Amino acid sequence: MQGRKAMLVLHGKQAMNEDVRSAVGDLRDSGWVLDVRVTWEAGDAQRLVAEALAAGYSHIVAGGGDGTLRDVAEAMGLAATQASLALLPLGTANDFAKAAGIPLEPASALALLNVAPQPIDLGQAGDQLFLNMATGGFGSQVTANTSEDLKKVLGAAAYLFTGLSRFSELQAASVELQGPGFHWQGDLLALGIGNGRQAGGGQVLCPEAMVNDGLLDVAILPAPQEVVGALRDLLGGDGLFVRARLPWVEIKSSQGLDINLDGEPLQAANLRFQARPAALHLHLPAGSPLLSHPG
């Protein structure tokens, strides 16, 4: 029975979600032992992961938005566990799940526990791990400044609305990026360093990223002269980006750069990003677009 025992770490706001309750019941009826623990405050997800691993759970489910998924994935990655992770995406953007082909319907998402997990990479920024993407420049500002109320009303379109309403505030960031065989220096409008492909409610910054290639995809949108067109390009994802695929990249910015790490803001003048190959075992659908050799 141990092989069919899992713990669901569920964001507190989703505790009364009837679709989630029904999906949990269906999975239990199919023979799984699925215990549920609910987060209340910062740090709970990490604590619950530690408790689950100490208790010998071989599967953990992260239920919530991109931030919750990142918290659980980071805790498991830092623990270097062989336990596997399944994602129950319940947020507004669900960027990683959408790019990976993970169902947004709770019962279908939980059913991925029956699919063999795949080893995937995690990204590392300084001493923090991330599952999906680090964004910098205006893209991170849009994500950070999109209100929860607006998300409730507009869903993922809230990010686009925020971007359009704030385009007059666009300011380029002067940065230098360096990695193996790669160097770029100048003013950028947006930056994506992706393990996954999209962030900020559907901005596909790294369209070719794979989660099992041991590399991070770097996308730089240089600052142009015409701001409104640049915002359109950022949200539309055309070919103006400078791109690279690297095992690590270092960023330097004399004035500091705002970074958004799977929904968590941070600021740094110097930061090293690197891929952590095969750092996590994740349940993904067969043929997931994020697998370089789909399982």
Swiss-Prot record:
UniProt enzyme class: transferase
Binding site for ATP: 39, 65-71, 92
Keyword DNA-binding belongs to the record: no
Keyword check for Cell membrane: no
Record-level GO BP terms: phospholipid biosynthetic process
Function comment: Probably phosphorylates lipids; the in vivo substrate is unknown.
Protein name: Probable lipid kinase YegS-like
